[in-house]
């Protein structure tokens, strides 16, 4: 009997996402329930955004939750390497095979030509797609241009009519028309693969038998299915999990809810409570109990109990469940968990340099640095009264800063400063005009340790969470203001 093998393949491009933990949990439970294996693979082909620091954060966050894997970059295994950036020669081999078989072709189209084609198609109200310009180039021309070092990509061929039947373990057969599919790029100009080629090659070579992934990938499933067909490989069974959603039913995003696992760790949530809550996202125990352990979830796991309705990730419900876990701990367990959270040596070392020069005894630390250890901070509207800005302008500045910070890919002091500086300059203000608003929003006080250093230490999600709280206290933005301010945001450089 074939051993069940599942995997999670996150990209190390930022803080580890609760959506990654959610999909990892269900893959882990499915594998363990069937006596199988769970693999961690790192999809780091986006060399501009991928970092080893983010990769380490993924390991730390999943292990904090109690999710362990049998094979991966850090633990090894018989199917390595487990980082896609280290498998380039493998993808090149299979990409060349597709070209040789006539299932893919070399494309020399420039970005400028592709943009022009898309613009023409959109003007005709057509779905933008590649027009096949390079699909039938003579072989000698292709070889000549390759020998000349001309920039190129490899694209797969796809049918233009009919439907692809996608067998989904949750929905049954799903029919998707081929005319919705573009001629997908498989190998980029930098020699690295796109998600589609790397995904299929890796899943096959690593013996993955079942793929549980988010339903946002369902519309592009025909491309993956066609690649398996082109290679002549057996396709894993597919399961498209419902997406986590905000309370307003929109897709879970950092603009409306904190999404990083690190945020919930910093806020003092218990890992077993967060894992329990993620387990309840679209799934339920046979007896409908709300509180259960990972071992209990594995024991009773059955995909037939997954609901296709978009599960709502509600911070209030998570907090309620976390409270249930806390109250059922012994006093000794509770004290140990508090100590582990409050006296985290790594976190304290980040804070200490900013506090040491401002205190004369240790009892002064709590009032000065308490905001580093809380979720929200006590907010006083009077602290946002500004000598130069009226209340509407105050809200506008905070909203614009929040939006700019939401688009920040790397959370570093210099980049945070750059975002705030860009907003100030665009509004013809000085940085010193904006900073008095940042102090109360982030620290709850009119003055404190460097607020920019504090934001770097607190992290992206917690900093943005506090800015949202400050905006809500001051009345937020009306629909009309939001539209007007979005135009201003889009005009701000950077």
Swiss-Prot record:
A motif ('HIGH' region) lies at residues 10-20. It is found in: Cytoplasm. One of its GO terms (cellular component) is cytosol. It catalyses: tRNA(Glu) + L-glutamate + ATP = L-glutamyl-tRNA(Glu) + AMP + diphosphate. Its cofactor is Zn(2+). Keywords: Aminoacyl-tRNA synthetase, ATP-binding, Cytoplasm, Ligase, Metal-binding, Nucleotide-binding, Protein biosynthesis, Zinc. It is an enzyme of class 6 (ligase). The gene is gltX. This is Glutamate--tRNA ligase. It holds the Pfam family Anticodon_2.
């Amino acid at each position: 009997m074939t051993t069940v093998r599942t995997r999670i393949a996150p990209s190390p491009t930022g803080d580890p996402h609760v959506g990654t933990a959610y999909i990892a949990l269900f893959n882990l439970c499915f594998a363990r329930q069937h006596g199988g294996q769970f693999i961690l693979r790192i999809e780091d082909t986006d060399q501009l955004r991928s970092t080893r620091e983010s990769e380490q954060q993924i390991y730390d966050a999943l292990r904090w939750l109690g999710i362990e894997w049998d094979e991966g970059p850090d633990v090894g295994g018989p199917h390595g390497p487990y980082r896609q950036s280290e498998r380039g020669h493998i993808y090149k081999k299979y990409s060349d095979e597709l070209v040789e078989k006539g299932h893919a072709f070399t494309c020399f189209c420039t970005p400028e030509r592709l943009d022009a084609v898309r613009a023409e198609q959109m003007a005709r109200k057509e779905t933008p797609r590649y027009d096949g310009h390079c699909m039938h180039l003579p072989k000698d021309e292709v070889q000549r241009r390759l020998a000349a070092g001309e920039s190129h990509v490899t694209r797969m061929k796809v049918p233009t009519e009919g439907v692809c039947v996608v067998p989904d373990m949750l929905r049954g057969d799903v029919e998707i028309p081929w005319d919705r599919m573009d001629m997908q790029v498989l190998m980029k100009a930098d020699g690295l693969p796109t998600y589609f080629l790397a995904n299929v090659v890796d899943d096959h070579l690593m013996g993955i038998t079942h793929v549980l992934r988010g339903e946002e990938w369902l519309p592009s499933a025909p491309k993956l299915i066609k690649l398996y067909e082109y290679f002549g490989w057996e396709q894993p069974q597919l399961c498209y999990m419902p997406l986590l959603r905000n309370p307003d039913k929109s897709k879970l995003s950092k603009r409306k809810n904190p999404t990083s696992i690190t945020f919930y760790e910093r806020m003092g949530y218990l890992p077993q409570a967060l894992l329990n809550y993620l387990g309840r996202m679209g799934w339920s125990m046979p007896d409908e109990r709300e509180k259960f352990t990972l071992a209990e979830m594995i024991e009773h796991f059955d995909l037939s109990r997954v609901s296709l309705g978009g599960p709502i990730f509600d911070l209030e419900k998570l907090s309620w469940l976390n409270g249930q876990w806390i109250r059922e701990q012994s006093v000794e367990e509770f004290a140990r968990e508090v100590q582990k959270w409050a006296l985290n040596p790594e976190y304290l070392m980040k804070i200490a340099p900013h506090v040491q020069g401002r205190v004369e005894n240790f009892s002064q630390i709590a009032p000065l640095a308490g905001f580093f250890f809380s979720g929200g901070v006590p907010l006083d509207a009077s602290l946002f009264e500004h000598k130069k800005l009226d209340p509407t302008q105050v809200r506008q500045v905070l909203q614009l800063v929040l939006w700019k910070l939401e688009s920040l890919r790397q959370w570093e002091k210099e980049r945070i400063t750059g975002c705030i500086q860009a907003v100030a300059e665009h509004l013809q203000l000085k940085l010193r005009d904006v900073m008095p608003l940042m102090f109360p929003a982030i620290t709850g006080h009119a003055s404190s340790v460097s607020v920019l250093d504090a934001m770097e230490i607190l992290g992206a999600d917690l900093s943005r969470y506090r800015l949202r709280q400050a905006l809500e206290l001051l009345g937020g933005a009306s629909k009309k203001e939001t539209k007007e301010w979005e135009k201003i945001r889009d005009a701000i450089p950077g």
